[in-house]
C-alpha cells in the first residue's frame, strides 16, 4: 500500500513512497478504542477529520495497513484548504497554462478544499452556509462526506470487514452533520448511527458511542 506505481528506482533513489501523516492521532485513538471495548483484535478505521484530514485502516493485529495521506499531506480527503486526491494531469494542464510549480502547490494546498468551493476553510462557516441553503455550502459538505465514504468502503475491503469507525479531531468530534452524512447509507456495512446521540455529542472529553443499538459496527 505504501508504494506508488512509478519506476521502482524512484523509490530506491529518492524514497518516493506514501508516508502518511497524523500518525500519533491515529495510533492513540486506535489503542484507546481497543481498551474501551476490551478487545485487542478489532478492525478499526480511524478518521482524523480536522482542517487537515486523514484516515487509516488498522487491522486486527493493530497494524496500520493503509492511510489516506501519501508522499505529502495533500493526498486523500477533501480538507479545509487542500484539494485531496486529484488527477496528476491537472498539474500538467495548469503548467501549460503558465502557472509555476510553486503557484500550483499554493493553489492545491492553500486555496482549495472547502476554501476553494465556499470561500472559507472553516467548517463552521461551511455548515452555516449549508444551513442557509447556499448551494456551494451544500455541495461542499456532500463532496466532503462522499470522499470519506469512498475511503471507508476501500478500507473495509482491505481489512476484510470493519468493527469500528473512530471519529476524532475538530470536525470528527464536533461536527454532527459531518458524522451524519458520512454514516448515511452505510447500513450494508453494518453502520447505523443513532441520530439523537450524534446530535447531542459536543466537545467530548472521552470516548462516546453513537451507534444505534442494532448497529454491527461501533
Language model regions located:
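Glycine-rich phosphate-binding loop of actin/hexokinase-like ATP-binding domains
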Residues: 2-96
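Internal helix-turn-beta structural module
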Residues: 138, 142-162, 172-218
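A mobile "lid/hinge" subdomain adjacent to the ATP/sugar-phosphate binding pocket shared
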Residues: 97-140
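General structural feature for long, well-ordered alpha-helical segments within catalytic domains
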Residues: 25, 29, 54, 87-90, ...
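Buried hydrophobic positions in well-ordered alpha/beta secondary-structure cores of metabolic enzymes
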Residues: 61-62, 108, 148, 167
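Beta-strand segments within the central parallel beta-sheet cores of soluble alpha/beta enzyme folds
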Residues: 43-47, 103-111, 164-166
Amino acid at each position: 500500500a505504501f508504494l506508488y506505481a512509478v519506476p521502482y528506482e524512484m523509490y530506491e533513489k529518492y524514497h518516493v513512497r506514501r508516508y502518511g501523516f497524523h500518525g500519533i492521532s491515529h495510533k492513540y485513538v486506535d489503542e484507546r478504542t481497543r481498551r474501551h471495548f476490551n478487545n485487542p483484535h478489532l478492525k478499526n478505521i480511524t478518521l482524523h477529520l480536522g482542517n487537515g484530514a486523514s484516515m487509516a485502516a488498522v487491522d486486527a493485529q493493530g497494524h496500520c495497513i493503509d492511510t489516506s495521506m501519501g508522499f505529502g499531506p495533500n493526498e486523500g480527503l477533501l480538507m479545509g484548504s487542500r484539494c485531496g486526491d486529484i488527477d496528476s494531469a491537472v498539474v500538467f494542464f495548469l503548467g501549460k497554462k503558465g502557472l509555476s510549480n510553486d503557484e500550483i502547490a499554493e493553489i492545491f494546498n492553500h486555496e482549495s478544499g472547502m476554501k476553494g468551493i465556499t470561500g472559507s476553510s472553516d467548517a463552521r462557516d461551511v455548515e452555516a452556509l449549508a444551513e442557509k441553503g447556499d448551494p456551494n455550502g451544500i455541495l461542499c459538505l456532500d463532496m466532503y462526506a462522499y470522499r470519506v465514504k469512498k475511503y471507508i468502503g476501500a478500507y473495509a475491503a482491505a481489512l476484510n470487514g470493519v468493527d469500528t469507525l473512530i471519529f476524532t479531531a475538530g470536525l470528527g468530534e464536533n461536527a454532527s452533520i459531518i458524522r451524519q452524512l458520512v454514516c448515511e447509507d452505510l447500513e450494508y456495512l453494518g453502520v447505523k448511527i443513532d441520530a439523537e446521540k450524534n446530535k447531542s455529542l459536543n466537545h467530548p472529553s472521552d470516548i462516546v458511542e453513537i451507534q444505534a443499538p442494532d448497529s454491527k459496527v461501533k
